[in-house]
Amino acid sequence: MLTLLLLGFAIITPLIDFNESHATNPLWTGHARFHLVWQVNAMIITALLSIVLLWFFNSITNHLIVILLNYLWIFSFYATVFGLKLFDGELNDINGVPPVFINILGREYEIDSNIQAITGSLVVISYASVLFLSNLYLT
C-alpha cells in the first residue's frame, strides 16, 4: 500500500506538475517555477529513497522513517494551505488544474484537486500506518 502511494509521489506528481499548468506555465515567474521543480524533485527523491528502504533494507526502523518522511510532505502541504493568506497564495491558477465538483445530498461542492489528492494520500498513509503499527503490537 505504501509502495503504491510512493509510486504516485514519484510518477504522478511530476506528470501533473512538469507541464504548462505548472513548471512551464507562462504566467509564473521563473523563480516560482524553479521552486516548484525543486519541490517536485525532492518529492521524487524522497519517494524513491522510501521505496529502496521498504524493499531492499526493510526493517521496523526504516518503515517508520518512510512513514514519517512521507507524512512530512502531507503535513507541509496542509501547513501551506493554512498559511495561504500570509503570502497571498492560491491553491490554483486560472490556467491550472480545474477543481472537482461533487454532489452530496443534492448540494454541489467544489473541491480543489490538490486538496483531494493530498487528502487521499493522507488516508492511504494513515491506513497503512495503522496496519503496520497494529501488526507490530499483535506479534
Please name every model-derived segment:
Residues 25-34, 87-108:
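Interfacial non-cytosolic loop connecting adjacent transmembrane helices
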Residues 12-37:
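Interfacial loop at the N-terminal end of multi-pass membrane proteins
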Residues 1-6, 58-73:
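Interfacial segments of alpha-helical transmembrane regions
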Residues 129-139:
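Juxtamembrane boundary at the C-terminal end of a transmembrane helix
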Residues 11-17, 75-91:
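C-terminal TM-helix exit segments that contain a strictly Trp-centered aromatic cap at the helix terminus
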Residues 103-123:
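Individual transmembrane alpha-helices with interfacial aromatic-anchor signatures
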Residues 33-54, 71, 75:
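Core segments of alpha-helical transmembrane spans in multipass integral membrane proteins
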Residues 42-50, 118-127:
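Core segments of transmembrane alpha-helices
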